[in-house]
Regions:
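Boundary at the C-terminal end of the N-terminal hydrophobic targeting segment
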Residues: 19-24
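Bacterial N-terminal signal peptides that target proteins for export
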Residues: 1-8, 18
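Sequence-level preference for short, compositionally simple segments enriched
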Residues: 25-323
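Core hydrophobic alpha-helical transmembrane segments of single-pass membrane proteins
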Residues: 12-13
């Protein structure tokens, strides 16, 4: 994790004396004790002006604390950047799970459980923890992303089943910590994980990609490491939520937590013919190319070299968050 920015403290002190009128501001400030403009993250997001742009984003500075609230960056709230004071001490959390009754009295189901929802394009977050504290009770999302061009740096994502849903669009994760046990990184988006720590709490599956057939990439993990909560934990690199699921691990350190076969077919042999699973230069006790399922690939050095942030996330607009 990166050290706390020295600039944050100065900005936070400056924000304490700023009036609540935010129509022309690009910096908003949040603290639980009420010493700044807002006491909740959602209040600050709601106050984001309509004048944001690539050169004039709205930066929301969040003081350390545990913010128990549902957070929603609505579609019109583009170019918003959430900056926490410290990743381990600045926590956005809630505790919904799929079995809980919703307003209609019926179980909420997976997609109504996220603690944080990002519908806006061009969202960024750094030095924050996104958590669903429901525990091992079934599907309970910490984060759902439907916006395009979202970037997360030095963030922590804590949950059990279905921790992160990357539903659509493109996302970039750098230096992040992601914990869970079943399908805890899932969805149909294109996402690049760079220098991230993936932690498996108990037996399960890391990924459950639902990549569309026409989409060249799903989830790419580059220079990451995979660990387990205890030596007895065994997990799979992924299983195909949809037939053309695409997941690639590049130069990733794998502890003994990984099942030797690597991948699971979700009890559907037909998906072995369509799933796009690959590795290159996996290392550690969990890296055993000879033991992997025959329907997953080991890439050549030339193939792996071509899988870059720019190639995976560039799209028609040339987005490159790794700059």
């Amino acid at each position: 994790m990166r050290p706390q920015s020295l600039l944050f403290g100065a900005l936070l002190l400056l924000g304490a004396g700023v009036a609540r009128s935010v129509s022309a501001q690009t910096n908003l400030y949040v603290s639980l004790d009420g010493s700044n403009q807002f006491k909740s993250v959602q209040e600050a997001i709601n106050a984001v002006p309509q004048t944001t742009s690539p050169t004039n984003p709205c930066i929301i500075h969040i003081k350390a604390g545990t913010y128990k609230e549902l957070v929603h960056a609505q579609r019109e709230k583009r170019f918003v950047r959430l900056v926490g004071e410290d990743a381990e001490k600045t926590v956005l959390t809630y505790n919904l799970n799929a079995k809980m009754p919703g307003a209609d009295g019926k179980p909420m189901g997976t997609f109504r459980t996220p603690s944080t929802i990002i519908d806006a394009d061009d969202f960024m977050a750094e030095n924050l923890t996104f958590e669903n504290s429901a525990g091992p009770v079934g599907q309970a999302l910490a984060l759902r992303v439907d916006g395009d061009r979202a970037a997360f740096r030095n963030c922590r994502f804590l949950g059990w089943q279905d921790t992160i849903l990357l539903n659509r669009g493109r996302q970039y994760f750098e230096g992040c910590y992601i914990a869970g046990h079943v399908d805890f990184i899932f969805g149909g988006a294109t996402a690049f994980f760079e220098n991230c720590h993936i932690h498996c709490l108990t037996n399960g599956y890391i990924t459950a990609a639902s990549t569309p057939q026409e989409q060249p990439f799903g989830f790419v993990f580059s220079n990451c490491r995979v660990t387990g909560e205890s030596p007895g934990v065994k997990t799979y690199l992924g299983r195909p939520w949809r037939p053309f699921s695409s997941v690639t691990y590049l130069n990733t350190e794998m502890s003994g937590v990984i099942q030797p076969v690597g991948w699971n077919n979700w009890k559907d042999p037909a998906r072995e013919k369509t799933a796009r699973y690959a590795e290159f230069n996996s290392t550690g006790p969990g890296a055993d190319p000879k033991a992997r399922v025959p329907w997953a690939r080991q890439l050549t050095a030339e193939e792996a070299k071509a899988i870059t942030v720019e190639k995976v996330l560039g799209g028609p607009d040339g987005w490159n968050p790794g700059k």
